[in-house]
Amino acid sequence: MKKTSLFVAEIALSHEGSIGNACALMDLAKNNNIDIVKFQDHWARYESSKDELFRVPIGFDKTRYEYWERTEFDQTEWSYIYDYAKKININIGFSIFSPQSFFRQKKLGNHIWKLGSGELLNNELIDILIKELNKKDTVIISTGLCEYSYALNIAEKFSSSVKEVFILDCISEYPCNYADYSFKTWLDQSSKLKKISYGLSDHSGEIWPTIFSWSYGCKMNEFHITFDKKMFGPDQKSSLDPSDLKNLNSAREAFNIISRNEKKKISSLKKNMINFFGRSIGLKNSLPKGHILRREDLLMRKPNGGFSFKDLENIIGKKLKIDLNYKEILKSEHFEK
């Protein structure tokens, strides 16, 4: 279990266009020790058209253009969100979907960028990022709609020019089913990478894929968050709610404690337990004064504190100087000198 694995809470558009909700979701992430909160900057005017439809209709906005437009923030609102992230001391990042949304967030000082799997087909945006990003920037890439080799090729274009690159295994279904994961095969490939870190972007709405990924040493684990899975919006069922986040945080804290010590240490309590459950040489039956001890007279009795098993050969042949009850453990004063 790797303590260095980053947890990314994808707020996306679960805020439904409300700055209050956006800040409250950041609080939810912060209170559960999330490392990075991530938003999506869908700027309808520069990204979409009236012909862009939902894969699964949500019953309120007829087109994605309407949805993006209804939930988007302007520059002033994004600036407020940035300031709030600084106030609560949590890192913030963005999925960007157009050159305009990139330059808007760059102007505000963002340095954590995600290219969703759909944007790996957006050559215009990729070319701009390659030119504009530097060693202050982190790039996150999802495989989702693309073959691993294609996503890796894009990731390698950034590896020499930015601070760090992550490539995340992703299934672009909301929610996705456990049976659809091919994570172990993907992990075997990604573990060979040198300049690119690997991880999981999960849409299951459960904590188990993240725990599985983390246990295999993945460097980044991303998941959507929400106040309630019954809330309106296309991502809510695929998100972790406050109860999920609490359980995930508890697991993370427990695993960190468990994995912290490389060498087992025996505490004073454990030493007392060893004494309690240890054994000493005793008698099978009560024996009279003057009896010379034989092997068949002896056995090991609890607790520890008398002669140990390694002393057995030295005890054989000793002569008792008193009558001795079998309930006693043998001590030096029981023998004639």
PLM feature spans:
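Catalytic cores and adjacent flexible loops of soluble metabolic enzymes
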Residues: 1-337
